[in-house]
Amino acid sequence: MANATIKYTTMDLYGILKSCKCSSDERLTHQSLSGGRFSVTGSKVGEFWRAVADRIESGEPIDISEARQKETPLTLDFDVVDKDCKEPVPDVLVNNIHAAVARWARSSLKPAPEDRDLCGVVLTKPVRQCAKGWKKGFHIQYPKLVLETGVAKNLVVGPALRPICSKVWEAVTGTAKDYLDPLSCTVPWLVYGASKPDEPFAWKIARTLDHAGKTIDFNTAFGDVETPPSWGRPTSDRHREAMVLSIHPAGRSVFFRRYDFTAANPGRVTRLADYSAVMAKLDVARQRKPAWNTDATKAHRLKRVTDLTAMLTADLADDRQTWLNVGFCLWQQTSGSAEGYKVWLSFSKKSDKCDEDECWTIWNNQMRPNSFTEGTLVYLAQKHNPGAYLNWLQVKSTPVNDIGTNVAMAKIMWDYYGHQFVCCGGKTQTWYRFDGLTWVESNQGTDLRSLISAEGGPLRRLLMRQLDAVTAAKARGGRDSGNEDDEEDSATDEDDSNPWDSELRRLDSEVLDTMVKRLRNNLKGIEMTGVKNNVLRECAELFYQPEFGDVIDSDPLLFAFANGIYDFREGCLRDGRPEDKLSRRAPVDFVMFGPIPKARHPDNSPVMRPKRMPGESVQDHARRLAECFEQDDVSASAGTMGKEDVESFSCNPNDFKGPVTKLLAFFASVFPDEGTRRFFLRNAAATFVGGNPDKVVLFWTGTGNNGKTVTQTLFEKMLGCFAVKMSTQTLTGRKPSAGSANPEMARLGGGVRWAVMEEPNSDETINAGTLKSMTGNDSFFARDLYCAGKTTFEIKPMFKLHVICNALPGIKDADQATWNRVRVVPFESTFVTPGTTAPADAKYVFPADTDITRKLDRLTAPLAWYLVYCWACIQNERVKYVPPPKVMEATMAYQKEHDLFRQFVEEMLRKDPDSTLTCDDAYTAFRDWTSANSPHGTVRRPKGQVVKCLEAILGKKTVDGWPGYAVGAEQQE
């Protein structure tokens, strides 16, 4: 019966093709390598794929190839022939070629592909001999990267990918080879499972690689791939693999994102090729480096995460956030494999709330690449089940030959503290220790050094255990005699608590004596300075993470309070994690004085685009896309929540209760005008979120006792080390020369959120270039004192800039881009102490609270909650905010007072319908006027710059100049 089914399948496949034959002038979709042209369309497509799948399952040969259409997935054919070596192409070479192609695609395709679109499938055949040598070619296919066939042929494979792949080949093998076929995306492509008539082997899937070149399950990589209904539903894994690996775009390409090639210059391709070669060399070096631990192997990593997860207690499984964090961590560490899911499910079953269907849905649909590391599991195990973790650590085997050495002791320290300490930096090593919330700098590793000799510490306990094991082996007489009784004793005595027993039995008594002596010396030595220093030096190599100093405090959406981390992505306060990489924390607790609305954040609201339906024309699909864009615009203005769910932003004390009411009463006295108060608090609401997206600097101005200093002190008390006071020279002085130390600018790194310049002198003017660079969100370099040039670090500004002054300072060489960043906040209140009177022009007068400084400490926690609350409300606003007139009027008055060109026009030009102001006359008059009147106008301005600035005020000039204007004061009537 089975044979009859196979026979029917064979006849069915070629019967389908026979009914789809086409002539030479018709468009073909498939062709037979033994002869025949076919056009398989309509309902025949589903029948064709079912027949192909049946032939693959039965092992019958197929000689059908697919013809290229207008669009094609990226396919790379490497024709490798080696005269001498019959070994297959190394996996490290293929993986690095794939990683290089992924880098190229990410930088050269528009729009940039996502990581999930860069999965590649490696197809191979067995190595076979031919007349020229050993054939061991391979294919790499990218089903989700769909390009125009002409673009792939003329701009991608030959000009870009061929030199990159050649460089990688040379880096791994030492010989540059151009094995990539330039016609890889042009010639017909064999259907999966098909082979040429003269070859017995078909191309088979060897492995699937993710964007980084790591092996991933095929269904995990392409589980989101959908095929047209006319193709039918796959009935087996082989059936689905053949459909996914089809290059046929008819009725299918619309289900994939298309990428238009952005031509890169040859220099860019060369740099990318060189970089890929360096990465390949490092990968080869890592694989060749001998290591006595097997942490890098997948099996060992799976065992480690399985053991660590088993130590987690049931209360952690009950906490949903921790339960999800463990799931994301396991998904990342196991690449979303089925084994990882089993580990997570086993942990989930510790809770009575476990729902296997929910676990399966989350694992397959919601899990995604993340920053969780094995350190998350280690930290949870150490914190919630320290005894089990130490017992597990004791069972971990140290090679017998390394017992008692400094390297072995350092490895023990790394096994236990590897996720709590980090060493980074160059010649001057910098150590960090994770204290459960943030990473705290440890002076020269002093904290780790003290743990080396700690009583009851892991190192001392494991050394004692190793000494007991070696002493026991020595007591048995050293090397085994080979007697059956000895073997029986060995089997009886050896257990998991002594992983070295079998190896120690094979050693001579002299070697055991040496090991005993070495272990006893180490137990004494760990209390001596020299041994501790040597172990710490070995630890520096194991704990070293060179990039740690560059990424610490770099996440703008994480902020550390004294009692936890507020995650603005998730909108919640949570425990600290090692992978947060935060080193600063505010001195105040985050107190939940009330509920905080869910913020509509870009990370939480992905936009879904409708797919093109089978049979739908391109024009109809384009119209539906236009409707989708209109709906997105409406939803963006209306928010993602219903009208009744959106909480409006309020700064009225009557809308709140308790300490928040006192806080807003304070701001109501400082800013009696509600518009100004709302503007100030809106800007302050983004304090905890890094960056300056609005690119503004606030100038706090007002004379007398008006609350500027008290307000600044309140924010300083709340932010602590996140707030920095700058010297006025930072903005008013000259830019430091290249390479010189600039400690003031260096202080602005490390996640600082609040930068203030107070009270510049009357003769100081702000440098417009420095002001724009500090508010433009562009990174800058700054060298601290006593730092070498190589250690100069790049600072990504996370702060908002504030200038506090009684009189607004001048801005040197300010253009319109400078004034667009300036906002003046008038402090109009006057606080009068007993026995004094307010000035005659005071607009708002309040009695001064002489005890306000002490009371500020009780306002810091309400301020922290209120700013987060305001930020969430602002994210959900539907109407674009417009600054109040009072702020804009003060800003325009400031601009008018310090805008040289407007002053020049008002003082030196007059309207005259019979005159025309020439460029030469205007430039001469402006030069003379600035020399006589401007305190900072001594810098000679080019004529073209003066003309351009005057055009912004007087309008576009004609060939002769500006008609209707003349030099001279306006005549009085």
Curated annotation (Swiss-Prot):
Domain SF3 helicase residues, every copy: 658-840
Biased composition (Acidic residues): 483-498
Alphabetical UniProt keywords: ATP-binding, Hydrolase, Nucleotide-binding
Ranges for region Disordered: 473-502
Annotated positions binding ATP: 702-709
Top-rank taxon: Viruses
EC number: 3.6.4.-
MF (Gene Ontology): ATP binding; hydrolase activity, acting on acid anhydrides
PANTHER family: ATP BINDING PROTEIN-RELATED, SF3 HELICASE DOMAIN-CONTAINING PROTEIN
Protein name: Putative helicase 022R
Naturally occurring in which organism (per UniProt): Frog virus 3 (isolate Goorha) (FV-3)
